[in-house]
Amino acid sequence: MALPNIADARKLGDEELATEILATKQRLFQLRFQQATRRPENPHEFKHARHRLAQLLTVERERQLENSPSEEA
């Protein structure tokens, strides 16, 4: 399984992006719980979820910076 592509995250709308961030955070919580209580089925899935969350948060931040007025003016 390959790591998720950031281009896919950039194609999402604002609502979809927020939903995806929430879903990924919930998945990470489940994986952490799974790691603490028993051996995870797919150990690499934790890395992929963290990577995906970082991508989604990066895209969200890029959009925030695009929409904010420039402070240099």
Swiss-Prot record:
Instruction: Provide this UniProt record's keywords sorted from A to Z.
Output: Ribonucleoprotein, Ribosomal protein
A GO MF annotation of the entry reads: structural constituent of ribosome
User: Can you supply a Gene Ontology BP term from the record?
Assistant: translation
Q: Does the keyword Oxidoreductase apply?
A: no
Statement: the UniProt record of this protein carries the keyword Nucleotide-binding = no
Offer one Pfam family short name for this entry. Ribosomal_L29
* Gene Ontology cellular component terms for the protein in this record: cytosolic large ribosomal subunit
InterPro entries for this protein? Ribosomal_protein_uL29 (IPR050063), Ribosomal_uL29 (IPR001854), Ribosomal_uL29_CS (IPR018254), Ribosomal_uL29_sf (IPR036049)
The UniProt family comment states: Belongs to the universal ribosomal protein uL29 family.
NCBIfam families the UniProt entry points to? L29 (TIGR00012)
Q: What is this protein called?
A: Large ribosomal subunit protein uL29
Which gene is the coding source of this polypeptide chain?
rpmC
